Every structure is written in structure tokens, then in C-alpha cells.
Amino acid sequence: MRELLRAGFRRMGKSIVFWLSMAASALWSGAIVAIRYSELETRPQYGDLDYILWEFTPMMGIFAAVFVCLFIGVEHSDGTMRNKLAVGHSRWAVYFSNFTVCAAANLAVMFTWVAVTFCLGVPLLGAPKISAPEILLNLALAALTVVSSTAIFLLVAMLTTNKAASAVACILLSLALVIAGSYFYQSLQEPEMTSPGMMVNSDGSMEWIDPQPNPRYLEGPIRKVYEVMAMVLPTGQQIIINDQYLAQRWSDFFSFTLVTIQPWTMALCSVLVTVLAVWTGAAIFRRKDLK
């Protein structure tokens, strides 16, 4: 296992995809800080480092999908996977070593974003207003979603020997997860009552409209189901973390139901998804015929 990990990390260090992902993460975070700084006078609500710090979270699934499918795809196409098995390594060891390397790579991309955002954001926008323990908690939750996303995409990549097919499948899956996570989150944000407003009558007079029950507001068992899905999906958690602080800033202007961060529930869901995806993928890979 240690030999597999050493070989995997050496290959990761030489991987163009890995370094391009790191560079893209650094440039993207730097660009966002620069844009927010340039808009401080006209759009100050977007210049808060508390919000900018988490903008990476909804995109980490796509970063993870691209790296995993290409990194593992090369192992399939070059015959590296078969060679590992031919020299006596077990399929379980091969699978878990690849998971460890891919998870470490994706976490490195994530923390590159965080480091660049802090290094540029603090001098330009000021220090975050939230406490250090809260930042560390959110970073830990975000890291767990990155690991669970890696486990999901690794399952697809390890079981798809064709590199092109693996890339298409992983990227489409990442987009589907983003759409699903956004759908469940947005559905939970619907307010229980509609906002009050004014109506113009036919005679030109104005009439005040009282708040009405919102037909799209979820309640009862269906709301519990949506909450569970938003927590189970890595993208659902990532959107919750990302929107938490911007939503608080806009709460005086818009009416919505804020989906709050539930640390223990979110962490447990990420761990369960990771364990289930890795165990399922390893069990199937153990019986797969590698061509």
C-alpha cells in the first residue's frame, strides 16, 4: 500500500492536470478578490470576505470531476492499472491508494483557493468578521464535501476503462449533482408567506396586499426529505456553505427561509457518502475484468 501511495503521489506531482487545477484555483480566487475590490463603492454587499471565502465551494465538484477522470483515465489507458495488479498488489489496495491520492489532490486545490483568498483579500477587503473557530468549522465541512465528491467520481472513473467515456460521465455527473443540489436548496429557501406589496386597481388607486401563504413553501414530511437530500448531496452542502453569509447580508431586502449550517449532520452525511461510494466502488472493482 505504501508503495502504491508513493507512486501515486509522485505521479500526482508530475501531473499537468493537477498543476493546471492548482493554477486555475489560484487565478480564479485572485480574480474574484480583485473584482470585488473594484466594486466596493458600487456593490459593497459583495465585498465581504466572509462571503468571498466560500465562493469556491459550489465549483469544487467540477474541479474534482475533471482531475479524477483524467488522472485515473491515464492509468487505464497506459496500462498502469493492470501493471499494479500484475506485480501483486490487491485490487482493494489499488482502489484505496487512488482514492487517497485523488482526495489529497482535490483538497490541495481547495486550500490553494483559500490561501490566495486570504493573502489577497485581507489586505484589500479587510479581515473576515466571523470568528476563527467558525472559519475552521466551515473549512472542515467543505473539505469533507470535497472528499465525498472525490469518492463519487472515483467510483465512475475506476469502473470506466475508456478515458473519454470516463471524462464525459464524470463531468455530466458533476453538473447533475450541482443542478440537484441547487434544486433542493432553492426549494427549501421558499418563504412560508409571500412578501407584502401594492396593487393598482382599475380606477388608479393603490391597494396594499397582505402577505399570503406561499404555495411553493415545503412543510411536513416532504420538507424533511428535501432537507436530507440537500445534506446528503455534496453539492447541496457546498451551496449551503456558500450562500450562508450572503443570505444573511440580504435578509433585510428579501424574504426567504435560510437553510442553516448543521455541522454534525453535514459531517455525518459526508462521511456516510464517502464510505458508501468507496466501499461500493472497491467491491465492484474487485470483480471487474480490466481489458
Which role fits each region the language model picked out?
Residues M1-S25:
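Aromatic- and glycine-rich beta-strand/loop motifs that create alpha-glucan
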Residues F18, M22-F71, F96-C170, V178, ...:
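Secretory targeting signals
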Residues F63-H76, L154-M158, N162-K163, S270-K288:
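Transmembrane alpha-helical segments in integral membrane proteins
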Residues V68-V87, R91:
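Transmembrane helix boundary and interhelical loop/hinge segments in multi-pass membrane proteins
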